[in-house]
């Protein structure tokens, strides 16, 4: 007699649902409300920064954590920096203008049709 083994209930933590990433590495995007733009160089499927960072955002503007978050080589009229931005706060930048961040040359090739190509040595 072949009895099927019973599977015990899983004790693994349940991962949050993962939303579809709207943007890709190399895309040029801009913030919906703030005056900056940048190139995506990494994507987190859900929020993966510190709770301290999250709580520093004014409550009325805090994005949901259950969405993709993007790491940007960002710029505004005054400086270049790295930004961490939720998907809901980004839109494609259609200006066709290059982003003038000093780290771009180390990660990406030329700008082509609104996106930067990742250099061969950085592709997985």
Where are these regions (language model features)?
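Mixed-charge, Lys/Arg-rich low-complexity intrinsically disordered regions
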Residues: 1-28, 34-37, 44-47, 121-124
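Intrinsically disordered, low-complexity, charged/polar segments
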Residues: 3-6, 63-124
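Structured beta-strand/turn binding interfaces of compact recognition modules in eukaryotic regulators
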Residues: 32, 41, 75
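Short, glycine/acidic-enriched capping/hinge loops at junctions between secondary-structure elements
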Residues: 41-42, 51
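Alpha-helical interaction segments
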Residues: 43-44, 98
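Short, solvent-exposed secondary-structure boundary/capping segments
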Residues: 47-56
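Short proline/glycine-enriched turn/loop segments at secondary-structure junctions
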Residues: 57-63
């Amino acid at each position: 007699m072949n009895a099927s083994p019973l599977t015990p209930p899983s004790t693994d933590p349940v991962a949050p649902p993962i939303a579809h990433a709207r943007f890709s590495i190399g895309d040029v995007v801009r913030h919906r409300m703030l005056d900056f733009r940048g190139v995506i160089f990494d994507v987190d499927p859900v929020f993966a920064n510190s709770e301290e960072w999250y709580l520093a955002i004014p409550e009325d503007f805090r994005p949901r954590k259950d969405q993709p978050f993007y790491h940007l080589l960002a710029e505004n009229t005054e400086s270049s920096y790295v930004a961490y931005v939720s998907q809901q706060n980004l839109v494609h930048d259609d200006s066709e203008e290059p982003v003038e961040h000093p780290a771009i040359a180390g990660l990406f090739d030329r700008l082509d049709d609104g996106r930067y190509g990742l250099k061969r040595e950085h592709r997985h």
